[in-house]
Regions:
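Active-site/ligand-binding-proximal alpha/beta "capping" segment
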Residues: 160-167
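Active-site beta->alpha loop and helix N-cap motifs at the rims of alpha/beta catalytic domains
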Residues: 2-155, 161
Length: 167
């Protein structure tokens, strides 16, 4: 189980974080890592605290396994090389897949994980709790809950968030 975050650890996440897009080649056949590097450098010049890699804006549900892993590895390394924090989207509608993505992000050195509610299957609040606890236990990364019910079909309640925060 991850250790609780203290106030000084949470202070690292103050400031602006940009959810970056995942750049592809002109024909869409491969990731464009030169453009990724340019994009992250541009964010640094803009004064952000960090970036979000492989979030919804970053095409996370459509990336193949190898693409996701390489994007996360390179994106985290580029961000850290510029002194930026890197939050990685690890959400999925499958708990097994989400925990796998959580481990991938941790291995890459991500500073935190952005975890969306499982989409399409509309879990109960107890189902959401089990899903997010499995993610928390999969890797020692702080988790940021991404509650977007218009896209996932289910909203986290404040009671559920309180229960998760006690983990």
């Amino acid at each position: 189980m991850p250790s609780p975050l203290d106030a000084s650890s949470l202070n690292r996440f103050r400031g602006a974080f940009t959810a970056i897009v995942t750049p592809f080649s002109a024909d869409g056949s491969r990731l464009d890592f030169a453009r990724l590097e340019e994009q992250i450098a541009f964010q640094k010049q803009g004064g952000v605290t960090g970036i979000v890699i492989a979030g919804t804006t970053g095409e996370s549900p459509t990336l193949e396994e190898g693409e996701y892993r390489e994007l996360v590895d390179r994106g985290v390394a580029l961000a850290h090389g510029l002194g930026l924090l890197a939050i990685v989207g690890t959400g999925s509608n499958s708990t097994a897949h989400a925990t796998h993505l959580q481990k991938t992000a941790a291995k890459a050195g991500a500073d935190a994980a952005l975890c969306v509610n499982p989409y399409y299957n509309k879990p109960t609040q107890d189902g959401l709790i089990r899903h997010f606890l499995a993610m928390a236990d999969a890797a020692p990364l702080p988790i940021m809950l991404y509650n977007i019910p218009s896209r996932t079909g289910v909203a986290l309640t404040s009671e559920t968030i309180v229960r998760l925060a006690q983990h």
